[in-house]
Amino acid sequence: MAQLYYKKVNYSPYRDRIPLQIVRAETELSAEEKAFLSAVEKGDYATVKQALQEAEIYYNVNINCMDPLGRSALLIAIENENLEIMELLLNHSVYVGDALLYAIRKEVVGAVELLLSYRKPSGEKQVPTLMMDTQFSEFTPDITPIMLAAHTNNYEIIKLLVQKRVTIPRPHQIRCNCVECVSSSEVDSLRHSRSRLNIYKALASPSLIALSSEDPILTAFRLGWELKELSKVENEFKAEYEELSQQCKLFAKDLLDQARSSRELEIILNHRDDHSEELDPQKYHDLAKLKVAIKYHQKEFVAQPNCQQLLATLWYDGFPGWRRKHWVVKLLTCMTIGFLFPMLSIAYLISPRSNLGLFIKKPFIKFICHTASYLTFLFMLLLASQHIVRTDLHVQGPPPTVVEWMILPWVLGFIWGEIKEMWDGGFTEYIHDWWNLMDFAMNSLYLATISLKIVAYVKYNGSRPREEWEMWHPTLIAEALFAISNILSSLRLISLFTANSHLGPLQISLGRMLLDILKFLFIYCLVLLAFANGLNQLYFYYETRAIDEPNNCKGIRCEKQNNAFSTLFETLQSLFWSVFGLLNLYVTNVKARHEFTEFVGATMFGTYNVISLVVLLNMLIAMMNNSYQLIADHADIEWKFARTKLWMSYFDEGGTLPPPFNIIPSPKSFLYLGNWFNNTFCPKRDPDGRRRRHNLRSFTERHADSLIQNQHYQEVIRNLVKRYVAAMIRNSKTNEGLTEENFKELKQDISSFRYEVLDLLGNRKHPRRSLSTSSADFSQRDDTNDGSGGARAKSKSVSFNVGCKKKACHGAPLIRTVPRASGAQGKPKSESSSKRSFMGPSFKKLGLFFSKFNGQTSEPTSEPMYTISDGIAQQHCMWQDIRYSQMEKGKAEACSQSQMNLGEVELGEIRGAAARSSECPLACSSSLHCASGICSSNSKLLDSSEDVFETWGEACDLLMHKWGDGQEEQVTTRL
């Protein structure tokens, strides 16, 4: 690496040193430019104004200059939130550039308002925008003000920009192949991806959605789903898109948190976004918004307590106080309703509008009846497997038994129910539910079993020993398929566990584990096939016949396993069962004395066991553990979401009767069929247009109702957004706390206030100051002060040292020097007295400010106290009663000889302070006025042009440092 810095070899004692130098040096600022930027930093309005005026005349200062951090004067003013200096700079036509973006990122609302209202004068010569942005811009070209404001999620700034009618580019679809997307991706794929990410980051801002969307809940649903799908395509930015998707989900959930009544909740959850569907009055109170939330997998929204409370109320309709009842009462009630489900179903078939017919339509009763029907079906399957009705086992085509005839209506009822569900919800929605796929497989197996039994009954009439049947006999295949369908039917009962709070999370964890098993099987099958191919290739030549083996048995199922790797299928079986320890090692032996072949085969077999058992199996366990832990961490949300999907399946109209009663046509079904047949094949003529007028009237009424419902929805959304914004701002202020930025703002306010006080004092000179790193000027001042201070240590804190009876009073380092006030003696007395009366309240307010910051209450007195908590021992100093007179020059000289010398007063011990103060006479009631007056009359004694309160910023720094450490000591200066 050293070769990058020097090339020739140097054998000097310092040859192991690497010379360093600045290779990318920047243009240095002049002394005037440094002073200009420093004045902007400190908030010195007068100095900045003077520098700008001189720049317009003499062109000695580049008002668009930048400090080493790339900040111009305008950016510094924005960072310090100094709006007065910002307005002053804009009035002098400084270069704006990215100032608006900078103000938005700093979240300075006042600066944003000022920049939005700023209009550049026409014809002015600005610095070229391209050069400035290319060199110093902190933002990419695709970032717009509204996008950056949305990234910061500042509601006030977003509102200001939206009122200006700003726009955001519309992102294309995820897999868009238009010319613009293809060309942009080919030219610069990184910029294309970053630009799309920035757009989606802006669109996902909760404040922007709340302000600009008519239906913010639906917008959050769709945007969250789109971002989730986009994370699967943009794998490089998967984490960012998933975070934005989660942000949209939480926004919809937080918005629903603001609902305060059941009416608001019902209006939100029953609202439809498609007006064509809203025109059907029978489909209004069907929780349309909640169905959309389930469709887009908005688990946080669905599991929200307000939503769950409304769902529970609808679910237990007709059973008030159900949750407060004892579990024994609940069990007996459910068992009673379950045993009565046949009578309730018959009552509904006969009279759907009767009390019993309406009772079975309730969601909870419907769930109990369907569960009881399915348990009855499982009980009959158990009877069929136990062969309660004995038949001849050797009949090739046996007729159906009584139990099988009883099972058939249930199977037909299940098939009819699945057909109706697919017809109502659509094929796409049907296949997205895994339980529907399981039902489809189960019903297919039952249909195949019934078909094969019919074929066997028709084709085979005789009796024959079962041992002599061929392998693919229809009866044998039907029995195998019926056994598999019994397993699936029993496992289907797990779906009902979702209704229970204890078994529901376990059922969800089981589903996640099945996904992990499928992922594991993909890798395992690859390993299995690889080793099966190798072992079969090695042992193919050593295959033996069955007659050569004991008991004429060939394969791994024999008492003595043999030919384990003779064929590919046999090898796959052998390797699979070896995972469970069911394969012996001697299967790798061969009858020939080929020890090398046996060694290679045993090594391959051992390697397979190590990979499958030690590596893959432990990986599967880790994956399943991770899935379970993921569910356990979000058990409440996952379970409530799954339970809601179960409940919603019973809230819908239709599917009231459980199998097998659902296959029986009801009078209502005959009525619907007759109306459809009459309207389709026998249309009636309507010469008077009576039906047309009736349809138009009903359409108008439904449309008016939909408009009213939409208006109610917009009112509720408006209230929810207001509450959400108020809560968001309140939480942000609560969580913000005290940060370093707060102390910087406090320091900036004190610095600005200091210059304002100096302007109020008047007669302040504006010296040109240099921000050079050399400390020559400071050392010169210190040497000057040291000359008058004797052997005292140097200190940056300089204050007045007033002699009183030839004894000095030491004060806190609050005031450095007083500027020279030329011509002060010539002013009239009224003017000086008015100035003194004006300055008094200002310093009183300053004392109150410092006392409040220390947590103390300060009462305004004739002698104001100024307290600074800087962790130093308390010291007190009182001004002497300085008698001021402007009558004649002699009296002024006599007053000047009262041993009032300006020097440096350091912070010392508090010892002797009381003694010194007791020797001094009491100060006048307006000590500050006396001090200002004597300073004006003795201006010739002041040989320093420094500001009055130059050390306030340093005292504030020390104050903040000590205040953070919890040291609340006080230094009090009495003026």
Swiss-Prot record:
Disulfide bonds join C553-C558. Residues 766-795, 816-838 are annotated as: Disordered. It is found in: Cell membrane. ANK repeats lie at residues 30-60, 69-97, 98-124, 141-170. Pfam families: Ank, Ank_2, Ion_trans, TRP_2. It is a multi-pass membrane protein. Residues 971-973 are annotated as: Essential for binding to NHERF1 PDZ domain. Glycans are attached at N461. Belongs to the transient receptor (TC 1.A.4) family. STrpC subfamily. TRPC5 sub-subfamily. PANTHER family: SHORT TRANSIENT RECEPTOR POTENTIAL CHANNEL 5, TRANSIENT RECEPTOR POTENTIAL CHANNEL. This is Short transient receptor potential channel 5. It comes from Mus musculus (Mouse).
